[in-house]
C-alpha cells in the first residue's frame, strides 16, 4: 500500500525556502494567492511543472480529488487534503479556465474504451505494449520502474530499475524480453520477468546520457535514439558491442525510431528540426529527408502496411505522409489547429491514429486514409480528462494501446468493426 503523505513531508519541502522564489527560479508560473497555495506548489512542483495546473481544462472538487489520488496519497492528512482540494476547485474550476480548448470532429465510428490503472502512484505510466501471452508491459518513468499487467487476472507486477534509470520506454525483443531505456543514467537494459534482475549496458560515450526510444531487428540487435545528445545507437546484446553516431545537424533531437516493412531501413523522427532521418542499420549512415513546412518538428512516426511513412507534425499541428520510394510528401492540418501538438501515432485498419496533446482534453484522432477525413474523441481517464498520450501501439487483436500519464492509466481502444457501422 502507498504511504500517506504526512505533514512533515510537506513541511520539509516548504522549509527549503520561498516556494514563489523556487517557482520563479524554475521558470514556473505564480499560482493565484489563497489558502492552500503553498501546499499545492510544494506537492506538485516536485513531480511536474506548475504550468500544468492552469493549463488544465479545470475540474470540480471531486474531479480534483480523483486526479490527485493518482499522483499522491493524502489520506493520512485529511486537513491538508481538504485545503489542497478547496484551493484547486476554487481557482481552477471546469469550463472557463480552459486555455487550450480542443476542436472535436464528430463521426460514425464508435469506440469501446477499457481502462487499467497501474499500481504505484505518480509513476507516469507510458508506452504500453502487448506481449505474446496477452499481458501488457509499460514504463513507469517517474516511478523508475517497468511493469507487467495481465488483463485476464487483473494482476500487476512492477520491477524497480537501477537508480536514476527513469525509463522513457519499454520495448519487447524477438525473445519477448522487456527492454528499457535509462533516460537519465545513460543505460539500455532488460529485465528478467521471473527474477526481476536487470541486465544493463552503460553507454561508452559520456555525452550519450539520454537513451530514448528502442527498436529491434529480427536478430535482436537493439537500435535506439538519444534526443538531447543528438545521437543514434546500436547494441549487440550477444557481444556487448555498442556503436553510437552523432547526427550531423545540431539540435536534430532524434526521437522515434522504427524499421520499414522490409526490415532493411530505419526511420527516425527529428523533434527539433523539419526532417526525418533514414538510417542504414549496418553502418548507421544517416540520410536526411527535409520536410516542407518550416515550423515542423516530429515526435513520432509509424510505417503503414504499404510502406508509407506516416508522421505527426508536432510543431505545426499536422499529419504527414512520406512515400519513401518517390520522395513525395503530403500533409494535412490537424483538426484542433497549429498548436494542437500531435504526439503518438499508429496505423491501424485503414486509419492513422494519433493524439492532439497541446489541447485540453487530449484528443484521440483518426484519419481515414482512403477518404482523407478526420474523426476525434476526448481521451477520458476515469471521471476526468487529464494527461498526455506519448506513444501508441497495436495489439494482435487489432486494437489500440494508449495511456494517460497523469492518471497512471493504460487504455485499450477497441474500434467498432466496419461492417457494424
Regions found by a protein language model. Name each.
Residues 137-142, 178-184, 222-228, 266-272, ...:
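Conserved beta-strand positions in repeat-built beta-propeller and related beta-rich domains
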Amino acid at each position: 500500500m502507498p504511504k500517506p503523505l504526512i505533514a512533515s513531508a510537506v513541511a520539509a519541502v516548504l522549509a527549503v525556502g520561498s516556494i514563489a522564489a523556487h517557482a520563479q527560479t524554475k521558470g514556473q508560473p505564480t499560482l493565484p494567492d489563497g489558502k492552500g497555495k503553498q501546499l499545492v506548489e510544494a506537492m506538485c512542483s516536485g513531480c511536474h511543472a506548475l504550468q500544468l495546473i492552469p493549463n488544465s481544462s479545470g475540474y470540480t472538487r471531486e474531479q480534483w480529488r480523483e486526479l490527485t489520488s493518482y499522483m499522491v496519497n493524502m489520506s493520512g492528512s485529511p486537513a491538508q487534503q481538504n485545503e489542497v482540494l478547496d484551493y484547486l476547485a476554487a481557482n481552477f474550476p471546469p469550463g472557463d479556465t480552459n486555455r487550450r480548448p480542443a476542436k472535436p470532429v464528430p463521426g460514425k465510428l464508435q469506440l469501446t474504451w477499457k481502462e487499467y490503472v497501474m499500481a504505484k502512484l505518480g509513476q507516469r505510466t507510458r508506452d504500453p505494449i502487448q506481449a505474446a501471452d496477452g499481458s501488457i508491459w509499460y514504463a513507469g518513468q517517474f516511478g523508475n520502474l517497468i511493469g507487467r499487467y495481465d488483463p485476464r487476472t487483473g494482476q500487476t507486477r512492477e520491477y524497480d530499475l537501477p537508480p536514476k534509470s527513469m525509463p522513457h520506454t519499454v520495448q519487447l525483443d524477438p525473445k519477448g524480453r522487456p527492454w528499457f531505456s535509462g533516460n537519465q543514467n545513460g543505460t539500455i537494459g532488460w529485465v528478467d520477468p521471473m527474477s526481476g534482475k536487470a541486465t544493463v549496458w552503460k553507454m561508452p560515450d559520456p555525452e550519450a546520457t539520454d537513451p530514448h526510444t528502442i527498436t529491434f531487428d529480427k536478430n535482436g540487435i537493439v537500435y535506439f535514439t538519444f534526443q538531447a545528445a543528438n545521437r543514434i545507437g546500436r547494441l549487440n546484446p550477444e557481444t556487448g558491442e555498442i556503436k553510437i553516431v552523432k547526427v550531423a545537424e545540431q539540435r536534430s533531437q532524434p526521437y522515434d525510431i522504427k524499421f520499414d516493412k522490409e526490415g532493411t531501413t530505419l526511420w527516425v523522427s527529428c523533434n527539433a528540426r523539419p526532417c526525418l532521418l533514414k538510417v542504414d542499420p549496418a553502418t548507421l549512415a544517416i540520410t536526411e529527408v527535409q520536410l516542407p513546412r518550416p515550423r515542423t518538428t516530429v515526435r513520432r512516426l509509424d510505417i503503414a502496411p504499404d510502406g508509407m511513412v506516416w508522421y505527426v507534425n508536432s510543431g505545426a499541428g499536422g499529419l504527414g505522409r512520406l512515400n519513401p520510394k518517390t520522395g513525395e510528401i503530403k500533409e494535412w492540418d490537424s483538426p484542433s489547429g497549429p498548436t494542437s501538438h500531435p504526439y503518438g501515432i499508429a496505423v491501424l485498419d485503414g486509419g492513422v491514429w494519433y493524439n492532439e496533446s497541446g489541447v485540453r482534453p487530449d484528443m484521440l484522432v483518426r484519419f481515414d486514409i482512403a477518404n482523407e477525413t478526420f474523426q476525434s474523441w476526448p481521451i477520458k481517464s476515469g471521471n476526468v480528462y487529464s494527461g498526455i498520450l506519448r506513444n501508441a501501439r497495436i495489439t494482435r487483436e487489432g486494437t489500440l494501446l494508449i495511456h494517460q500519464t497523469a492518471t497512471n492509466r493504460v487504455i485499450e481502444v477497441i474500434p467498432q468493426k466496419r461492417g457494424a457501422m
